[in-house]
């Protein structure tokens, strides 16, 4: 089977809307590139950019979504985008991200691609927790700012013995980190079957019991999410999805939230939503190149 690989550079301010558009369109897969090693950086070029890069993958027969993507970009970005595309085989599709994916440390964790585990695990420094991750077709390599922000904070939360909910788990990287930090029970859910498969694979590759880390297909309305009590809810999801589900988020039985996936331009709007609908207050904020981490607590 062949796929259409579309390589895009778009303004960062429309990235949130673009990912929401891709989710609603049900594209085969996509990911955002943080560091593009194919493009040399000039010595005086800033790392922080007003643009962001995506790779989008469409099944060969999915010509409709390619047209929709072009229309979306023309309407929302005008002429301020760059697009190129090529045909690739299934093996290339599944292997494409490996070129950009090497072991690296974030806070208390070292993220290690599963294909490099034999060497990387043995060289992980003492006190650093190794996370073996193969994202497959799901979001969550750890390179993206939103994932880095959450991982950087998780090591400070004292998760031992806690019950953790991870909504929009993607590759399962955050759930794996929670389990390896001592959480007693984690429920990881995603509406994308690719995410469910990837998270399950990564759970098993890290030798985490299914009794500790349960992976299911679903969203905020998944019954166990609303029925059970949680010590922490993690949601690394775009602002549009968080906004659409704010009432369901408010009804989750937890007092502690960790949100990422919100761009700086939407931060105040999201905080206003949390204040009015969820209740409570922000206890920790951190920004990384235009993306926001928001830790939120409400009284028990």
Residue spans of the language-model regions?
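A structural alpha-helix within SAM-dependent methyltransferase catalytic domains
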Residues: 23, 151, 176-179, 246, ...
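SAM-dependent Rossmann-like transferase core, predominantly class I methyltransferases
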Residues: 90-159
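N-terminal auxiliary segments of SAM/dcSAM-dependent transferases
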Residues: 3-121
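Active-site beta-strand termini and strand-to-loop segments that position acidic
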Residues: 106, 296-299
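S-adenosylmethionine
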Residues: 191-295
């Amino acid at each position: 089977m062949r796929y259409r690989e579309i390589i895009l550079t778009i303004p960062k301010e429309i990235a949130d809307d673009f990912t929401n558009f891709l989710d609603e369109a049900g594209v085969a897969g996509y990911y955002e590139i943080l560091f593009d090693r194919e493009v040399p950086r000039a010595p005086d070029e800033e790392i922080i950019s007003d643009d962001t890069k995506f790779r989008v993958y469409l099944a060969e027969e999915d010509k409709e979504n390619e047209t929709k993507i072009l229309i979306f970009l023309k309407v929302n970005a005008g002429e301020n985008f760059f697009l190129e595309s090529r045909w690739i085989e299934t093996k290339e599709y599944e292997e494409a991200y490996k070129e950009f994916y090497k072991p690296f440390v974030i806070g208390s964790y070292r993220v290690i691609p599963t294909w490099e585990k034999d060497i990387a695990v043995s060289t992980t420094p003492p006190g650093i927790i190794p996370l073996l991750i193969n994202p497959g077709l799901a979001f969550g390599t750890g390179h993206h700012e939103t994932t880095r922000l959450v991982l950087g904070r998780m090591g400070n939360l004292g998760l031992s013995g806690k019950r953790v909910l991870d909504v929009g788990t993607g590759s399962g990287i955050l759930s794996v980190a929670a389990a390896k930090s001592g959480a007693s029970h984690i429920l990881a859910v995603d509406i994308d079957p690719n995410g469910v498969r990837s998270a399950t694979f990564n759970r098993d590759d890290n030798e985490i019991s299914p009794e500790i880390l349960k992976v299911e297909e679903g969203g905020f309305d998944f019954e166990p999410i609303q029925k059970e009590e949680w010590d922490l809810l993690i949601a690394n999801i775009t602002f549009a999805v968080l906004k659409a589900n704010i009432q369901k988020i408010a009804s989750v039985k937890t007092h502690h939230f960790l949100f990422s996936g919100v761009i700086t331009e939407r931060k105040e709007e999201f905080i206003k939503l949390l204040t009015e609908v969820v209740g409570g207050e922000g206890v920790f904020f951190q920004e990384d190149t235009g993306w926001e981490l928001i830790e939120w607590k409400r009284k028990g």
